[in-house]
């Protein structure tokens, strides 16, 4: 397997995992304000 492919897969999984987390944090901050 190519290291570039692994890096792309890793970044994709990171984005899919952190995406909802960041959105949740933004919503919580808006709710507090």
Swiss-Prot record:
Name of the gene this protein is made from: psb30
Protein name: Photosystem II reaction center protein Psb30
Assembly behavior: PSII is composed of 1 copy each of membrane proteins PsbA, PsbB, PsbC, PsbD, PsbE, PsbF, PsbH, PsbI, PsbJ, PsbK, PsbL, PsbM, PsbT, PsbY, PsbZ, Psb30/Ycf12, peripheral proteins of the oxygen-evolving complex and a large number of cofactors. It forms dimeric complexes.
Secretion signal, residue range per the UniProt entry: none
Native source organism of the sequence: Euglena gracilis
Keywords linked to the UniProt accession: Chloroplast, Membrane, Photosynthesis, Photosystem II, Plastid, Thylakoid, Transmembrane, Transmembrane helix
InterPro entries in UniProt: PSII_Ycf12_core-subunit
GO biological process entries: photosynthesis
Upper classification of the organism: Eukaryota, Discoba, Euglenozoa, Euglenida, Spirocuta
Compartments it resides in: Plastid, Chloroplast thylakoid membrane
Chain ranges passing through the membrane: 7-27
Main subcellular location of this protein, as a coarse class: plastid
Signal recorded as keyword: no
Family designation: Belongs to the Psb30/Ycf12 family.
Cellular component GO terms, alphabetical: chloroplast thylakoid membrane; photosystem II
Function, in words: A core subunit of photosystem II (PSII), probably helps stabilize the reaction center.
Lipid bilayer topology: Single-pass membrane protein
Highest rank taxon of the organism: Eukaryota
